[in-house]
């Protein structure tokens, strides 16, 4: 696939997924848990689109290096998310 076409498809897919997430949040009467589940689904799909279309994940000859980079990014993301949640919960419980 041509680079310009690939970037255009990725950009449009990202915009569509973002608009769908906003629509689900603002204009549906689903339960909160259902909304969160759907938004997380859109987020994971959008992360895959970003990795495949913009980060050139499939264009390397050395698959081991790409795998290491993706695993490292996942670990850093999990540390950031879990650490943020932990700090927020600790701050919230100390103010009650």
UniProtKB/Swiss-Prot annotation:
The lineage of its organism: Bacteria, Bacillati, Bacillota, Bacilli, Bacillales. Keywords: Cell membrane, Membrane, Oxidoreductase, Transmembrane, Transmembrane helix. InterPro entries: Cyt_c_oxidase_su4_prok, Cytochrome_c_oxidase_bac_sub4, QoxD. Pfam families: COX4_pro (PF03626). GO terms for molecular function: cytochrome bo3 ubiquinol oxidase activity; oxidoreductase activity, acting on diphenols and related substances as donors, oxygen as acceptor; proton transmembrane transporter activity. The gene is qoxD. This is Probable quinol oxidase subunit 4. Catalyzes quinol oxidation with the concomitant reduction of oxygen to water. It catalyses: 2 a quinol + O2 = 2 a quinone + 2 H2O.
């Amino acid at each position: 696939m041509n680079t310009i076409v690939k970037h255009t498809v990725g950009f449009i897919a990202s915009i569509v997924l973002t608009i769908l997430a906003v629509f689900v949040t603002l204009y549906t009467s689903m339960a909160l848990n259902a909304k969160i589940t759907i938004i997380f689904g859109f987020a994971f799909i959008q992360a895959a689109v970003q990795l495949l279309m913009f980060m050139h994940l499939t264009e390397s000859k050395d698959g081991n290096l790409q795998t290491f980079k993706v695993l490292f990014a996942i670990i850093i993301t999990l540390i950031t998310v879990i650490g943020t949640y932990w700090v927020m919960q600790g701050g919230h419980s100390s103010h009650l």
